[in-house]
Amino acid sequence: MGTSARRALWLLLALCWALRESGATATGRKTKCEASQFQCTNGRCITQLWKCDGDEDCVDGSDEKNCVKKTCAESDFVCNNGQCIPNRWQCDGDPDCEDGSDESPEQCHMRTCRINEISCGARSTQCIPVSWRCDGESDCDSGEDEENCGNVTCSSDEFTCSSGRCISRNFVCNGQDDCSDGSDELDCAPPTCGAHEFQCSTSSCIPISWVCDDDADCSDQSDESLEQCGRQPVIHTKCPASEIQCGSGECIHKKWRCDGDPDCKDGSDEVNCPSRTCRPDQFECEDGSCIHGSRQCNGIRDCVDGSDEVNCKNVNQCLGPGKFKCRSGECIDISKVCNQEQDCRDWSDEPLKECHVNECLVNNGGCSHICKDSVIGYECDCAAGFELIDRKTCGDIDECQNPGICSQICINLKGGYKCECSRGYQMDLATGVCKAVGKEPSLIFTNRRDIRKIGLERKEYIQLVEQLRNTVALDADIAAQKLFWADVSQKAIFSASIDDKVGRHVKMIDNVYNPAAIAVDWVYKTIYWTDAASRTISVATLDGAKRKFLFNSDLREPASIAVDPLSGFVYWSDWGEPAKIEKAGMNGFDRRPLVTVDIQWPNGITLDLIKSRLYWLDSKLHMLSSVDLNGQDRRIVLKSLEFLAHPLALTIFEDRVYWIDGENEAVYGANKFTGSELATLVNNLNDAQDIIVYHELVQPSGKNWCEEDMENGGCEYLCLPAPQINEHSPKYTCSCPNGYHLEENGRECQSTATTVTYSETKDTNTTEISPTSGLVPGEINVTTAVSEVSVPPKGTSAAWAILPLLLLAMAAVGGYLMWRNWQHKNMKSMNFDNPVYLKTTEEDLSIDIGRHSASVGHTYPAISVVSTDDDLA
């Protein structure tokens, strides 16, 4: 074979190899799939979970070849088609088998309801909890659970409204419409007060001792009026330099003055304001506020009233299946494409090789699911539950990434998802909501001078605690059936048993200067609170015997607070400048910011422990928002100037969020995912400040690690839960009172006595500074006479090492001077005054032995003759 023939043969082999490689690449055979994927014979990558699952996901079916016959576990239900599903999914009203065999009448007609459940009828396979019967909400598909319920009968200490609603008899003829139909205020005699009471202009009664005490107790402030007291009430609040004081006494940021949005209770921040005009680059909302011009018609409501999104026209007219956009920019109707006429300037509507060619006929156009042919070209589409991941290949949609897709638990399935409920809840098949099983949940809220409760199902409305002064914060230990609240006028935290008669309560914690919010740790039995006056966050045992500052720095206007003892974290809001929401360990460690942008007045926060999210109210932005517990996935639930005029506090239960609005003096409720289904639960309130849901499922049980091995975790003072950052995190740590610190054993406390040492010429003095604050009644007894030397800073040990050498040097110098003195006494000396060095002999020699001096050693004099009399004196 000649050289030219061999060369041609090599070229032919190289060409064949290149064609083989290009073919392999074209079919995707050389495409490398990820470790969690399976590679089809045709090169496509699918998730390993889809291999041998009974569905052909590879177009060539290679994912279902050589599969071992699948057997279901004992805890599974076997569908007629061989599919396996959990047993609990059988006969739950939701078909989970592809053939629907798990919900077939043959399978489900023999189903018997469990204890504490009732059947929805002879022809129904549905069971619901007994507590859902006659609760005012249809839970059976047939509505049978709300039939033959009869009229609600109120108890002897309740009043029956015309609507059938039950309210406390204390609410009758109190000057407020508590029935919401006015029937509790009909035929009322003129109100009278007792001999030791004062009657407000609103007819309500308060103790006579509360009159003219510079604290308005009447809702109309008539007890502190000029006519009653002969003087204006003294306002004790002193606002910082960055804030201004409202006529009603509270402080707000200076920048909120004359911004078009009333922030003071009396609206005094918007009085005598100059007329506002927007800049040329701004858009003026209908309410007069200004936003940047670029925010108009951006698809987001930036104006509170939404006027920036009114009358917006779609700029892009080529959206939708009936439009075609030319490459030259024109937009034409799809019917004009491939009609053999020039409708685009560049003829892009008439490509000869592409018109009326059905690409879907060849290999389904390369689409993994659905191929849709069009006049020019084609497009791939996916079946329900799938989405395009590379314009041709369909992948499963993880619907569970949407927090509101399921009420509680979401399980992602191939092409779909399954919703389930947490323990203690059961799904209402009519609504898909996970509803609590057991006692009726209720809302408990403060109303300044009393604490009230309203049932969320039967709407029973009663008074729990009365004759209070100025209640601002509220929480509960539900397992112990105890309420806790803070009274800003009495500067204390109180408690009462929820089953006790109205009026019986005990002072637990005193000297709380200006409590803003409280949060009860129901597992470790402690209470946390924010204090706006001292700018601190504190923690104490529920009996108030032990307490301490958890944080007393970097706080400006601490407001709401919430705890999660199951994970060991505490969360709080701060509306100071800059406003923020923070989180930290409940032991005071691992402090970090959670929300720092687009936040101005975060008044109330609450935790959704089931969905692991934090919700908060912004009174300045009139907004209800949420984030996950790491500060990610932020969502706006509701933005409303009407229902969020001045929101103060909120709470969450099931799929609903409830909040108090101070300006509207009402309690509202809405869907926690969408903000829809708005409803008014209570109105005509009097300075309501805080609200909670009362139900055993609100506070899930957890292990108190401080009582697991030894009492109080072996701690001398407080035992606090540690943040569970990872599996190696400690369960708890010991903590000491203010002015004390933990010893090396991590359990015992010792006084933090600071030793300050300073030096002077010829002398050294030590001053001991003892702690001056932090000890409270009930704290540990540590004798202050025992001083402590704190751990020396780096380098101090070296100074102690050379101290003996310095003492030896001083002794040598002293001996030398004594010898010189003896020598001078035995010889004559002459002293010549040098006109140049006019210094006295007292300045001739200076020996500085101070530890902190810049120069250590001798300073030699300018005169050679030295007198030692002064040195030895």
From Swiss-Prot:
Signal peptide span: 1-27
Gene behind the chain: VLDLR
Keywords (A to Z) from UniProt: Cholesterol metabolism, Coated pit, Disulfide bond, EGF-like domain, Endocytosis, Glycoprotein, Isopeptide bond, Lipid metabolism, Lipid transport, Membrane, Receptor, Repeat, Signal, Steroid metabolism, Sterol metabolism, Transmembrane, Transmembrane helix, Transport, Ubl conjugation, VLDL
UniProt domain EGF-like: residue ranges: 356-395, 396-435, 702-750
Residue ranges of the motif Endocytosis signal: 832-837
Glycosylation sites: 151, 765, 781
The protein's name: Very low-density lipoprotein receptor
Subunit structure: Homooligomer. Binds to the extracellular matrix protein Reelin/RELN. Interacts with LRP8. Interacts with LDLRAP1. Interacts with SNX17. Interacts with DAB1. Interacts with PCSK9. Interacts with PAFAH1B3 and PAFAH1B2, the catalytic complex of (PAF-AH (I)) heterotetrameric enzyme; these interactions may modulate the Reelin pathway. Interacts with STX5; this interaction mediates VLDLR translocation from the endoplasmic reticulum to the plasma membrane. Interacts with CLU.
LDL-receptor class B repeats: 439-480, 481-524, 525-567, 568-611, 612-654, 655-697
Keyword Thylakoid set for record: no
GO cellular component assignments: apical plasma membrane; clathrin-coated pit; glutamatergic synapse; receptor complex; very-low-density lipoprotein particle
Tissue specificity annotation: Abundant in heart, muscle, and adipose tissue.
Disulphide bond pairs: 33-45, 40-58, 52-67, 72-84, 79-97, 91-108, 113-127, 120-140, 134-149, 154-166, 161-179, 173-188, 193-205, 200-218, 212-229, 239-251, 246-264, 258-273, 278-290, 285-303, 297-312, 318-331, 326-344, 338-355, 360-371, 367-380, 382-394, 400-410, 406-419, 421-434, 706-719, 715-734, 736-749
Annotated GO biological process: cholesterol metabolic process; dendrite morphogenesis; glycoprotein transport; lipid transport; positive regulation of dendrite development; receptor-mediated endocytosis; regulation of synapse assembly; ventral spinal cord development
Record field: transmembrane: 798-819
GO molecular function: apolipoprotein binding; calcium ion binding; calcium-dependent protein binding; hormone binding; reelin receptor activity; very-low-density lipoprotein particle binding; very-low-density lipoprotein particle receptor activity
Post-translational modification: Ubiquitinated at Lys-839 by MYLIP leading to degradation.
Coiled coil regions, renumbered to chain: none
Cytoplasmic compartment residues: 820-873
Extracellular domain ranges by topology: 28-797
